[in-house]
Amino acid sequence: MIGALALLLVIALGEEDKEPATGFASHRIVAHAMGGINGYTYTNSLEAFVANYEQGSRVFEADLLLTTDDRLVARHEWTINMSKLLGQQTVLPAAKQGTVLEYAQFMDSPILDIYSPLDIEKILDLMQAYPDAYLVTDTKETEAGLVTEQFKLITEAAERRDPALLERVVPQIYSRDMLDVVNKVHVFPEILYTLYQSQDSDEQVIDFVQESGVDITMPAARATKSFVQKLKKAGARVYVHTINDEDEIVKLSRMGVDGFYTDFVSEVDLSSFRRLR
């Protein structure tokens, strides 16, 4: 009996001694595609960033693609459906609505008539203006040459302003091999291994976390309590995407999930969820 009480005391003291998370790890919300704005998603726009920042979000995921002239811009995909979703049927010629754009045409095409497109230069300008904001990259590409090109563009643009900006850039990688490709360009302090393209088994992912120290993000469908707990035991913070429902956030949080990619839930909203652990 005395031994059991002593063990409980040790556990309790251990919990009290845990340092609160700081920096990137202190935030639980990742604003998906710069966050939703006025009910719209996937805008990756300047106005979405500002609106979600004002609502308390500090971590912003941006979709980043190369233009035909090799500039890095914030767009989810080069498809007709995306052009329709972004309300660009009138600002883009029909032949351009489902193809990769030139940089100038992309930047000169308003989103939903009123929102401003972003490129990596303007995103880094925002990070300078908002010095507690973090960027999570969703660069899509997996071929080593394209990955290298994308991350060189990111690092070179940051270094022209202030190399310290790179401390607030969090790359997403899509395979275990991609970590080495990114590290050859720049060693970022935080890396997220996103599993939505991965064919790795749970065991392979857990082993990779132990070897590399990366954190994990995954679709909700893959987030089982057992997998989440094993990842956390291996040392990872665990994120799930893309979640906009309070009940689902509460359920996943109780499983041990640390953070949530979301369109419409802010850090302020999260703090009001009474059932959240």
Model features per residue range: what roles?
Residues 3-277:
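Phosphate-group recognition and catalysis centered on beta-loop-alpha active-site segments
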